[in-house]
A protein has these predicted regions:
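A structural motif
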Residues: 60-61, 124
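Active-site glycine-rich loop that binds ribose-phosphate moieties when present
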Residues: 83-90, 108-122
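Glycine-rich, proline-tolerant flexible connector loops at the mouths of alpha/beta enzymes
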Residues: 1-19, 69-76, 129-145
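Active-site pocket-lining/capping segments in soluble small-molecule metabolic enzymes
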Residues: 64-106, 149-186
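Conserved, mostly hydrophobic/aromatic
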Residues: 55-56, 119, 123, 161
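Active-site-proximal loop/turn and secondary-structure-junction residues that shape catalytic pockets
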Residues: 2-5, 40-43, 68-72, 105-109, ...
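Flavin-dependent oxidoreductase catalytic cores
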Residues: 9-39, 45
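Active-site mouth loops of central-metabolism enzymes
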Residues: 33-47, 98-112, 186
Length: 186
């Protein structure tokens, strides 16, 4: 599925290397644990789990961020983020697997704290945000998330905040196309 709902892509989509191969090289050469993102909604559940098991076993990647689709209004052919998180944490890891799972947090999304709780219940141990250029939504989301955790008597999962420099107007246009909120004064 492509991203036609957003209009014309402002930057040409480049052919990319296999992220798990890059992750393995990063681990081998630099000596740090890699975290690999995996979009799970575009292929069937069994194909996703096979990829995840191979990534853990053959590439020695132990940290994954499980990513969904661009919109909750689209019916994707693959499993949901929560289905995959649940399968990894409750089945794969309990049978000898060793994957530390995370998820994506999008601070501008309404009621994102509920999504974080649900992902945590299904096995997400940490979250990383979409790239941030405005602090208001992340401050609000963290506050709501802490309140929900307190109400449920559970602990908040680690939240990694993502930042990136912008060097051109073309970068800004692409980030906006991706759905990143950038204040007009930026």
């Amino acid at each position: 599925l492509d991203e036609n709902g957003r209009g014309k892509r402002p930057v040409v989509n480049q052919k990319r290397g296999e992220p798990r191969e890059f992750g393995r090289l990063l681990q081998d050469i630099v000596g740090v644990e890699a975290i690999v993102n995996r979009v799970v909604v575009h292929e069937p559940f069994d194909a996703q789990m096979k990829w995840i098991e191979e990534t853990n076993r053959d590439y020695e990647i132990e940290n994954l961020i499980i990513v969904g689709g661009e919109s909750s209004n689209v019916k994707y052919p693959g499993p949901s983020v929560n289905e995959v998180l649940h399968s990894i944490s409750r089945e794969y890891n309990e049978n000898g697997g060793d994957i530390f799972c995370g998820g994506i947090a999008i601070p501008s999304r309404t009621a994102e704290s509920k999504n974080l709780i649900k992902k945590s219940e299904n096995g997400s141990e940490f979250f990383t945000t979409q790239v941030l250029y405005d602090s208001s939504n992340i401050i609000k989301m963290i506050g709501h998330y802490q309140e929900r955790c307190d109400e449920l008597n559970t602990f908040p999962r680690r939240l990694l905040l993502s930042f990136a420099p912008v060097s051109s107007q073309k970068n800004i246009e692409f980030l906006k196309w991706l759905g990143v909120e950038i204040p007009s004064e930026t």
